[in-house]
Regions:
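The catalytic-center signature of Zn2+-dependent metalloproteases
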Residues: 221, 228-289
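Short pre-active-site segment immediately N-terminal to the catalytic Zn-binding motif
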Residues: 211-227
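Surface-exposed patches in mature extracellular/periplasmic domains of secreted proteins
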Residues: 165-179, 241-246
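Short, low-complexity, Pro/Ser/Thr/Gly-rich segments in the mature regions of secreted, periplasmic
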Residues: 286-301
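Zn2+-dependent metallopeptidase catalytic core
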Residues: 147-172
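Catalytic zinc-binding patch centered on the HExxH motif and its immediate surroundings
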Residues: 151, 179-208, 218
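Bacterial Sec-dependent N-terminal signal peptides
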Residues: 3, 10, 15-70
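Disordered inhibitory propeptide/activation segment of secreted metzincin zinc metalloprotease zymogens
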Residues: 47-147, 260-265
């Protein structure tokens, strides 16, 4: 009987030990699960934080969906601005100013798809203008949109520069107010020294070329330079220094602008300080193409 009792005690002790061990194992397993859940939760939180940090917030006044659309098209949105796009006669339309002188109406921007674009002079866009004659008019109405005498001279000189190269495109220039059926319209708007234009699409050049009233104090050569530059955008050229904007004293890449930034063979990949298509200009510009500009134009057209 004693032996049986002792055996029972031994069995009981063994059972208790086994039970305790199971409890310890279960507790350890539970702790491991809790720690695992805690670690997983932290990881998810960290991932969410990173994703939130990578989602840029639109500048004040620009809808988030519009801002994200511009980014998806690889525009440089650093100085993106919402503004009003003025047409001859004073009609206003909502637009966005990108990269200093690229003006795109709201509807056009939202309809753009990647690959719809342009290039710079020595970097071009993926969309070009169809070969042939481009009709261009200098708007001369007696109102705030009419070109000044200097602007008219600059436009004439700029068009002459393009036509002198014997390209597959040419410009037929007139002056007047009947612009509706013209391919391109060059007119004046209020603003600081400079101008703005858009990119070609569907084989057609950008139609609206705006020259700012703030250009008035500058020479005819500077007018020629600015107008020639904006015409360049309108037929498919990006800024020669799109990758750095060095001409503006900056160091920021404009992106591929939804129309590509395709390097043109035979032209520099680096800084070309005398190119007509640099992002910014000086008061000493002569308005002429340099040799790299000409190489780029002849390669494209």
């Amino acid at each position: 009987l004693k032996r049986v009792k002792n055996r029972s005690k031994q069995l009981l002790t063994l059972t208790e030990k086994t039970s305790k061990m199971k409890k310890i194992k279960n507790l350890a397993l539970l702790m491991a699960i809790v720690l695992g859940l805690t670690f997983t939760s932290c990881t998810k939180d960290n991932t969410a934080t990173i994703e939130e940090e990578e989602t840029a917030v639109a500048p004040v006044g620009i809808p988030q969906d519009v801002f994200e659309k511009a980014q998806s098209l690889h525009f440089n949105t650093f100085d993106m601005q919402k503004t009003m796009f003025e047409k001859p006669g004073g009609k206003m339309e909502e637009a966005y100013l990108l990269e200093g002188d690229i003006m795109i109406p709201h509807d056009q921007l939202m309809a753009m798809e990647f690959g719809d674009g342009i290039t710079s002079k020595q970097y071009r866009t993926s969309n070009l203008v169809s070969d042939g004659v481009i009709t261009i008019i200098g708007y001369t109405a007696n109102n705030s949109n009419g070109l000044t005498t200097k602007m008219q001279t600059g436009l004439q000189w700029a068009v002459d520069n393009y036509n002198a190269l014997g390209l597959d495109i040419s410009f037929q220039l007139t002056f007047g107010t009947n612009y509706q059926n013209k391919d391109m319209v060059v007119y004046q708007v209020s603003g600081g020294a400079g101008g703005s234009a858009g990119f070609p699409s569907g084989g057609n050049p950008n139609k609206w070329v705006r020259i700012n009233s703030g250009l008035a104090p500058y020479s005819n050569n500077v007018h020629e330079h600015v107008i020639g530059h904006e015409i360049g955008h309108s037929i498919g050229f990006r800024h020669s220094d799109y990758f750095s904007r060095q001409s503006c004293g900056q160091n920021s890449n404009e992106g591929s602008a939804g129309v590509g930034a395709i390097h043109i063979p035979g032209t520099p990949t680096g800084w070309d300080p005398t190119s007509l298509m640099n992002a910014c200009f000086s008061s000493s510009e002569d308005g002429e193409f340099n040799s790299n500009d000409i190489t780029a134009l002849r390669w494209m057209y």
